[in-house]
Structures are given as structure tokens and as C-alpha cells.
Amino acid sequence: NINEAIKELLNGSSKKINTQIVITTHSAHILNSKIHTSNSFNNISYISTPNNEANVVNLHDEIIITSEEDKTKKLNDLKFIKKHIKFKVSDMFFADAIIFVEGVTEETLLSFYIDNHETLGLNKYYIAIFNINGAHGLVYHDLIKLLKIPTIVITDLDIKRTDDEKINFTPINSLDARTTTNATIQKYKGGDDISNITDHYEDENLYITYQSEAVEEYYATSLEEAFILQNHDNNILNNAIKEVKPKIYEEIVGNPETRKNLVDNSYKLQNKLSKSKSDFANWLLYYLSIEDDKEKHPKLPNYINSALDWLKTKLALANDGQ
């Protein structure tokens, strides 16, 4: 590891020589090694050139978590980041942009669409996509703002339902008097009331987005439900659902098929898919991959497209030096 290599090098030097060593790297592995062997962000300098200007951030443990006032929680959050960053997340330091998602479906779809849909204008950039569920992603927000990397946080509206609504799979057609259980939205809105929620939140280089508008008269509570509402008549979506939940699909759509029934049963369907999200994502990816006509691909929900438009603008401005 890095620390042992430096120690060995210094042991072989003359005792009369004071040595300073600077290591520059584009390797997430080397950065990982530094953080984990020293158990610290100290002595790491992050250098970037946004808008053709040098930006240097001298990292140290005291500035990684700044918004948390509880000392114990702050120490635990820092410990979590040091451990968790080992699992691919160190790539964020070398990315042009970052997208945080909360599920395998979002991760799979965004990776495919960014790479394969040139109209999004993002496939020429290195965009790191991290699947970090729920409130755990919040721990990274202070660090992301320090690094000034354009970042999208895609989260879920997570509408709180009554027991009867859960049992009957009642779709939601109004946000009046509704609340959310989502920790990210609660933080940026300053509470759990979503009756007058805005379509997104921006905080410096962070863009937080969620299912803020009704689709086919219903408010989705997850990406899967939003995707179903947006694309209920799309062949690829229907084929993927049939592969994963054939009996549920036939029960809802009927024979002959009435695909409009997917709209009224969107919450029920996303609930039934909740334990099969990896299968659902993989079948979507399969049918997307074999369909060369991109006009036949399902559409990304509007709240995601709006976030990607924001990101494209941010990256274009940085690339042009503005």
C-alpha cells in the first residue's frame, strides 16, 4: 500500500535529508489505499479545473462532515464514509459529474440511456453513478459541495400511505395534506409536508429531483411506478413486466390486453415488483439492448430528464470555461 511504500522509501534515505513526497494520481485504487491505510482524508489535495480555473481543496477529516451538529453522529458519519468509499465511491473524485440513485432500476436505466442515447448529450463525459439507498446518500452531500462536482440526487417521493391504502394498493391522485417519509426531501424542504412541494431543489452544485408531478393523473412514489405510468403502452416495458410477474401482469392487463389498466394499478404493480427489482432491471436492459430503434425505447420520466438537462448545461458551461 501507499503508506508502506513511502515508509520503505524514506527508510532508505539519508537521515540528514528531510524529504517531501507528492504523489499525483488518476487512480481510484491509490486513493482508496491512502484513505484506508491512514484511516484519514488528511494530506489529500483535490485539484480540478472548472471553468478553466484551478480549484484546490485540501481535504482533512474536520471538513468532510460540516452540516451535522451532533458530535457522535458526525464521527459516525465520517467513519461510514471512510469505510463506504472503498466500494467504488472513490471514483467520484475523478468524475466529471455524479449521479446518486436509490435503486438498481435507476442505476441500470441511467447507465444505459446515458451511454446509448446521444440526444441526452452526456455520453462524452465520465459520469459516476452510485446506488446508495436513502438517507445514507445524505452523508456525502457536504463532501460533494466541497469538491464542486455537478451532482444529481435522484430520490423518491415516498408518499406516506394509510394502512387501508397499502392493503388496497390505492394510487395517489393528489398531494393535498400528504407527507413524505423520505429523509432527503425532508432535509431540503425543511419538513415532511409535500402538499406544495417544488419540482426540485438546488444547493450549490447539487440538484435534488423526485416524482413531483402527476403522470396520467397519479403521483408515483418510486422510479418503477413513474416508469410504468410514463410508458404503460410501451412494448419493452410490458415485455419486461411479463417476464418478471406473468401472473400479476395477466391479472391486471387481462386477455386480450388492456394496457391502460397498468395506469390504475401502477402502485400495485410496483409493490409486486419490489422484491424483484434486479430481475426487472435486467429484463428492461435485455429488451432495450436488442431494440435498435431508439424511438421504441421507453421514455425516462420527466423529473429525471429535467435533471439530466440541468447536468448537461452545467457540464457544457464548465467545458466552455464559463
Residues covered by each model-derived region:
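Short regulatory helix/loop adjacent to the ATP-binding pocket of P-loop NTPases
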Residues: 30-42
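Conserved catalytic/dimer-interface elements of ABC ATPase nucleotide-binding domains
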Residues: 45
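Catalytic "switch" loops of ABC-type ATPases
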Residues: 27
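Conserved Walker B catalytic segment
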Residues: 1-11
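Acidic, divalent-metal-binding catalytic cores of TOPRIM
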Residues: 16-18, 31, 48-322
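Conserved D-loop beta-strand region of ABC ATPase nucleotide-binding domains
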Residues: 24
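Glycine-rich, phosphate-binding/catalytic loops in enzymes
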Residues: 5, 39-42, 116-118
